[in-house]
Amino acid sequence: MLQTSLTLPAPAKLNLFLHITGRRPDGYHNLQTVFQLLDFGDELTFTPNQSGEITITPAIEGVPLEQNLVYKAANILRSHVNRPELGATIHLTKRLPMGGGIGGGSSDAATTLVGLNYLWQTGVSPTTLAQLGRQLGADVPVFVEGNSAWAEGIGEQLIALDLPQYWYVVLTPACHVSTVEIFSHKDLTRDTLAITVAAFFEKGGKNDCQPLVERLFPQVRDAVDWLNKFGPAKLTGTGASVFAAFPSKDAAQKVFANKPKHLNGFVAQGVNESPLHQRLPEQCITGV
């Protein structure tokens, strides 16, 4: 018997650095990055049924249902288990900006895969769920696996990391940065030398997309310049969001309270285990 409903988090992420080490024959780029999960994000409420219909509320303006990552995630899981009668109503409470570089759509898709696998009782293993997620986007597997992680390849080769749990100020300028546009731009740095995990912990790293994004989007540059007054500011992903780390919640909130009014954002703590995995029963995570 299907559970009536369940509300689950879809946490944000930050890229603590992002090195582009080469371009592959298939057009994708080889990357090195660290995904830092946060204790803030979207929420999804799932109500499973046997109608064969996937309903998403509210509709996202300008995004057809078939292109909605939540819908695509539900559909790909249902197709994988060949259970066309499975359905669900999914209500998305959106807190993360689209096109912000903080993983909103990818995290929503991952929460949908993990949550519906549990509610539909389809018994798909976490490894297979991550593989299904990869078909939806390179960032989806880290949210399925549920740990802050070192990533290589196109971002799908993951090693869980134990990161310092800093507090972060995350600011999002009023612009949309296209990942496709940035990764296809002729001026993007694509030849950064690979580093080791130990080198990251010793010296950190940069975001190879940041100089280009700042040049193309003055709003991002201005946000970086403002946040740099309080700590080293970095772009996450291809933007548009930028962030800086602080040692305490109080320190982060003091900076955030003085942000320019035109910048949206939030304060959140870095976590090593996803809030999604903290919320779910153990058997949902292990596949037992």
Swiss-Prot record:
Membrane-crossing segments per the record: none
Presence of the UniProt keyword ATP-binding in the record: yes
Gene: ispE
Active site: 13, 139
Biological process, per Gene Ontology: isopentenyl diphosphate biosynthetic process, methylerythritol 4-phosphate pathway; terpenoid biosynthetic process
Function: Catalyzes the phosphorylation of the position 2 hydroxy group of 4-diphosphocytidyl-2C-methyl-D-erythritol.
PANTHER family documented for this protein: 4-DIPHOSPHOCYTIDYL-2-C-METHYL-D-ERYTHRITOL KINASE, CHLOROPLASTIC
NCBIfam families recorded: ispE
GO MF annotation list: 4-(cytidine 5'-diphospho)-2-C-methyl-D-erythritol kinase activity; ATP binding
Similarity comment: family membership: Belongs to the GHMP kinase family. IspE subfamily.
Source organism of this protein record: Saccharophagus degradans (strain 2-40 / ATCC 43961 / DSM 17024)
InterPro entries noted in UniProt: GHMP_kinase_C_dom, GHMP_kinase_C_sf, GHMP_kinase_N_dom, IspE, Ribosomal_Su5_D2-typ_SF, Ribsml_uS5_D2-typ_fold_subgr
Enzyme Commission number: 2.7.1.148
Pathway(s) of this molecule: Isoprenoid biosynthesis; isopentenyl diphosphate biosynthesis via DXP pathway; isopentenyl diphosphate from 1-deoxy-D-xylulose 5-phosphate: step 3/6
Record-annotated disulphide pairs: none
Major enzyme class: transferase
Binding, ATP: 97-107
Record's catalysed reaction(s): 4-CDP-2-C-methyl-D-erythritol + ATP = 4-CDP-2-C-methyl-D-erythritol 2-phosphate + ADP + H(+)
Record key words, sorted: ATP-binding, Isoprene biosynthesis, Kinase, Nucleotide-binding, Transferase
Pfam families: GHMP_kinases_C, GHMP_kinases_N
Protein name in UniProt: 4-diphosphocytidyl-2-C-methyl-D-erythritol kinase
Gene3D superfamilies per the UniProt record, alphabetical: 3.30.230.10, GHMP kinase, C-terminal domain
